[in-house]
Each structure stands twice: as C-alpha cells, then as structure tokens.
A protein has these predicted regions:
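Walker B catalytic acidic pair
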Residues: 348
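Zinc-dependent metallohydrolase catalytic domains
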Residues: 2-25, 29, 206-343, 351-522
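Noncatalytic, helix-rich "gating/capping" subdomain that lines the substrate-entry/channel surface
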Residues: 1-212, 261, 266, 278
Length: 522
C-alpha cells in the first residue's frame, strides 16, 4: 500500500483487498433485476444502499392502496437498476475488473428521481464521485484505518487496544461471535444441510410443494372474480415460482472457505470474507432464481434458523430444514398433521399473490399481475373485506377493547387464508386417491382442522398480546405484521365452508359467518 502512486493503482488494490477478505470502504451488493443477478458497490461508511432497500419487503404491501405513491416508486426502482456510465466512473470500472465481474452485470444510480429516501440515489452518486476524487494519500490513510479494524480479530491484546480508542467495547468472544453470525452462514448451512437434508427428503418435500402448486393452478382456474387475462398472468407466475426447499440444489465451492490451515481468528476472518466475496462474484449475472438461495443464506442467515418466506423480486419461496423435520413434519403421525403443516408452505406461496406479492411479475420485477383495473379493484375490495373482518377480533384473552389491526396484518391474513385452502384441498385430493369415502373421509377432514389448530397452539401473557398488537418501543417489541395465533385460526376457519359442516356450527354460534359473507380471495 505504501508503494501506491496513482489513483488507478489504488482502485486496483481495493479490488484485490476485497477479493482477499480485507476490510475496505466498500461491500459488494448483489440483487435481482430483470431475472438475473446484478451487482453494485455499497459503501460501509454511511452510504449503505441497495436497490431493494428503498422498498422494504415487510412494508411494501402498504403501498398497494396508494397508487400516487406507487407511481413515484416505479421510476425510482427503474433508476436504481440502470447500467452506469463507464466514462463517468473509472474507479468502479477498475474495481469490478479486478473482481472479475463483467460490466454488463454492474449497476449504479445515475439520476435523481422524484422520491428520495435514506440511502438515496443522490447520496450514493455523490459518495461515489467523492471517493473517485480522493487523493492517493487520503486513500492510504483511509485504507490503513479499515485494515487496522481487523486487529480486533487477531488476539485479545489487539482487541483491548482497539476498545481503548474509538470503538465500542467488546470482549474477544463477542467479537468472534459477531463475526461468525455475519460470515459463517454459508459454511454453517452447508454442514447443516449435509446432516439434515438428504436427497430423498428434499425430493419428498418437493413433491408436497408441487401438489400445492397444482392446487393453486386449479384454484386460479376456478376463480370466479378474475378475468381470463389476469388468470393467465397468475398461472404464469405460479408456474415460474421457484421452490427453494431445505437447501440449495447445488453448492458453489467459491463460497466454502478451507479453514483447516488457518492459525488465528484473523486468518479465519480473511478466509471467510474472501469466500463470501468470491461467491458474490460467482453469482453476478446468474439467473436470479438459481442464485436466490445462495444470496439469502449469505445475506439473511443460515439454514439453522426456523424460517420460511417468499421474496417477490425472485418470485421464490424459501423453506428451511426445520419445516422438513419433526415435529413440524413427522412421517410417524397421521397425514392430516403433515398436510396441515403444509399450510405454512401454502402461506408462502400465497404471499406471491397477496397485497404486496401481486405487484411482482413472474421474473421478480415490479409489474403487477392484473390485466385490468376491474380485477385490481376487485382484489382491493376483497382484501378490504378481510381487513374489516380481522379488525373485529378482540385480541386480549379476558377483556374487550383492543382489536386486531386488520390493515397492518392484511398481507399475512391473505396468505393464511390462501395457504389453508391450498393445504386442505391438496389433502382432500390425497384422501380421495387413497380411497377414503363417507364417514372416514369426514373424519380425516376433521383431523386436518384439528391439526391446523394444533399448529398454531401457543401460550403467552395478556401483556405480550398487547405488545405484539400495538408495539412497545420502550420494551423493544415491534408491532407484529402477523395476527396473533388465536386470530390466525379463527379468522381462517370461519371463512371455510367445510368447518361449518364438519363441526356442526350453527347460526347462533359466536363465530358463525353467513355463507354470502365468507371471504374468498385465492
């Protein structure tokens, strides 16, 4: 570094340092655009920015009924994925060439659109130009500072020195744990999958998922409120949806660090960071669905967590191993239990068509599935019916007054209702193939409903119910975008016709809903 004399040499060194796992002012962001993986540099020092951060997945459903805001958001997202001007940004050209990434896969915001938020296009542009104009001596000083930050991973004496200066106090163990939480996800997931996700198990679970896909196709075909053109769009989307189940279909060696020869934690740090960077470079330009599971693991967390979710800009569902193992899936129990638990999978599939998911097309770009405004308005009307219905539920166990927030939870409630129908219809088809008829068929249907209730069984205090519903900033409890467990059961089954027949529910019963008021969306 001391031998640097030109900016070009400095930029080239930055790329080399990134490849070797050292700290620099930059991180490499990978994101989905136009059905493939694009990349861009995001700054570490206050310039964090990725195209998808402008609309958080967990909040974007709230834009569904705000067309004016959506009209502004669309050009913003378009701006974030425009290829950059090579002549204007020679620093980026040099860094990406050193990383071995094709410039065809590189993006940078190059305009100031109408909507500016934190981590904005304008801020990122200014930061990039500022760094590009930084002198060699200033770069040396900055790079030295970044490299010295890694001293905390070398030994306890180095950590003590760093803590005594400008950094927050950490123990050596805490520093290592923080690092592991961020950089060990791919290796940890690889080892976990080898132990718990067999090829046979993955094939079996994929078979269940394909049953749900086929059921969704049938429900689209039988839908009574959508036009044929919108049905075609929805069918194309469910056909194209990627099911990431258990573990990636393939693992990339670039992302797996060999730690067997490393002597210090710092050696591990550099090796793992280097592997992470090499994997991101490998993913650049790849089809977004093929890359999706790898990106999620390195960016969001390892397969050891209990998680299942859908991400619109991949048009992909992700099912982690916990949902394939006991007690969630258990081959030793009645099929009703396992199919009822598949509701969680159906829930994630339906997220691709909820108040947020319906805005994404089959390749994961922002283009909703509605072929006509009449379909769009009917979907909004039915979603509003669900909002109104869920808003009638009292969430406190032994008192009235606090109602469920149907608007805040609408996307999850749409997914719950759709997920139930996908799992239940699939189970009934399975039973009929097995030869169940009459009273035995009825009994198995009842068991499905009971298993669904068991899936959502839980126990908590009235205070927790209140905090989850309203949020409690003082206690660090965020408002939950999901309805509480009891409401997730009652809100769904009361909108299904079979519940009334199977459990002899009468018009005089508390949760009776007249047939014409039962809500159907998907």
């Amino acid at each position: 570094m001391n031998a640097l004399t030109t900016k070009e040499e400095t930029w080239k060194l930055i790329g080399q340092l990134m490849k070797e796992g050292y700290s620099t002012p930059f991180e490499l962001a990978v994101f989905s655009v136009g059905g493939k993986m694009g990349v861009m540099l995001q700054g570490r020092a206050g310039y964090d920015y990725t195209p998808n951060s402008l609309i958080k997945e967990s909040l974007s459903w709230q834009l569904a009924n705000k067309p004016d805001l959506m009209a502004k958001i669309r050009p913003l997202r378009g701006a974030t994925t425009r290829g950059f001007d090579i002549e204007k940004y020679p620093m980026l050209v040099t860094v990406f060439q050193e990383l071995g990434i094709s410039l065809d896969d590189v993006y940078l915001p190059d305009m100031n659109p109408d909507v500016i938020e934190a981590g904005s296009v304008e801020q990122n542009m200014q930061a990039t130009l500022m760094m590009q104009n930084t002198s060699v001596e200033e770069w040396k000083e900055a790079l030295t500072e970044f490299l010295l930050q890694d001293a905390i991973y070398f030994d306890e004496e180095a950590l003590e020195y760093v803590n005594s200066s400008e950094y927050s106090s950490l123990t050596y163990r805490q520093a290592a744990e923080n690092f592991a939480e961020r950089y060990l996800n791919y290796e940890k997931s690889y080892e976990f999958a080898k132990a718990y996700v067999s090829a046979d198990q993955k094939q079996l679970m994929t078979g269940y998922a394909e049953e749900l896909r086929q059921t969704f196709r049938e429900r689209i075909r039988n839908n009574v409120w959508m036009s044929d053109a919108s049905k075609q769009n929805a069918t194309e989307k469910i056909n194209a949806m990627k099911f990431n189940i258990g573990a990636p279909d393939e693992w990339f060696e670039e992302g797996l660090a060999d730690l067997s020869q490393e002597q210090t934690v710092l050696d591990d740090v550099l090796a793992l960071r280097s592997a992470r960077m090499n994997l991101k470079c490998r993913l650049a330009g790849m089809a977004n669905q093929r890359a999706s599971f790898h990106v999620i693991i390195i960016e969001e967390g390892s397969l050891t967590t209990v998680n299942a979710f859908y991400i619109g800009n991949y048009n992909a569902m992700f099912i982690y191993p916990a949902f394939m193992l006991p007690p969630t899936y258990n081959p030793e129990v009645n099929d009703a239990h396992n199919y009822a638990n598949m509701m969680a999978w159906g829930h994630e599939i339906t997220h691709g068509f909820d108040t947020d998911g319906a805005r994404w097309n089959k390749i994961g770009d922002l283009e909703d599935i509605w072929a006509s405004d009449a379909d769009r308005q009917e979907f909004k009307k039915r979603s509003q019916q669900l909002i109104d219905y869920y808003s009638t539920f009292d969430v406190m166990p032994f008192e009235t007054g606090l109602k469920n927030d149907g608007a805040y939870t609408v996307a999850e409630n749409v997914a719950d209702l759709g997920g139930f129908f996908l799992a239940y219809d699939s189970y009934v088809k399975h039973l009929k193939k097995q030869g169940f008829t009459g009273d035995q068929l009825r009994l198995q249907k009842q068991r499905f409903y009971e298993a669904y209730g068991y899936f959502w069984s839980g126990k908590w205090t009235a205070e927790n119910a209140k905090n989850k519903t309203l949020g409690n900033e003082a206690k660090g409890v965020a408002k939950d975008e999901h309805s509480l467990f009891r409401e997730r059961v009652n809100g769904v089954v009361t909108n299904t016709d079979d519940w009334y027949d199977l459990f002899d529910v009468k018009p005089t019963d508390k949760f009776y809903v007249a047939p014409e008021k039962r809500i159907r969306i998907w």
